[in-house]
Amino acid sequence: MSRPYQPQRYSLISELHKNFHYVDVSVIQSEFKNVILKTVVPKLSQPATHLEKGDFLLKICQLLMIHREEEQQILNKVKSNIIYFLNELWSAEYGKVQEQVKNILCEVKLDKTDSELSTYLAQEIPKLTVLKYPTHFKVCEETIPNGRWCLHNLLGIEQYYKDFSNIVLHDPETSLGSVQAYSRLSKLLFWCDSFMNKIYPCNAFNSSINQVVLWSTMFHFYSVAHCNDCISESISFTEALLKQEVSAFYEWCLEEEYEEDRMAKFMKFSADQITILSTHTDLQNLAEYIYSYKKCLINRRFE
């Protein structure tokens, strides 16, 4: 009786599910090198490894494609979050702070480009904190809401500083924190018990302004990534390696005189059809073929 096939688990696939929108190609390359699949029949380990590497790359490629397809929707949602917490600020404040929040809300709702909105938020959001705490808060020199801007403008996060810096200090040209990662940071801001202190004593203001700062930073990073199509470098790199592994498996089939194996031939054709414009659904049939061949090689007990 053949043993059931148990898919191997790879940390990068988990990271792309939980923590990253995309990662630098060097990270993909590093884990790819360590992918291997040993079989009971020694001579089948090489083709099985080609399939395992292909399966690993295919999963990475599908996740990246899904993330790319979601980018505009993510930007819309993040902008909605910014507006929500600005409204929370407006409801909780009065006087000059409330008036300034109203002005910001009006500008945010205008038809600005993503870049224009990011620059505007970077300039105007810190002014609210200066109005609220004029003797204790100084505006940082950053003119865009990047990671340094974010860490400077968040109030009372000392106990969670490392959690925030691990996400917001990424360079969007190479890697980007996921929606889930930013949502976890947002949750930490709700839980943060150091808001109430002598320097920044207004809990309602601190809580809302921190959320505005965090989501403004995420909006900036995702707008840069979306505008520059940063994720496509990772997709292109992964796609090229995937084609190589599928081709190597097909060459093995030919060497073993399996040229009549029509599914292997079609599998190579399907891989060759993948382009930078492909979607995750375009790869689904390939996933089924790779999985099927892996099971066959793993379950072989004799040459």
From Swiss-Prot:
It holds the Pfam family Herpes_BBRF1. It comes from the Viruses. Belongs to the herpesviridae BBRF1 family. This is Uncharacterized gene 49 protein. InterPro entries: Herpes_BBRF1. The gene is 49.
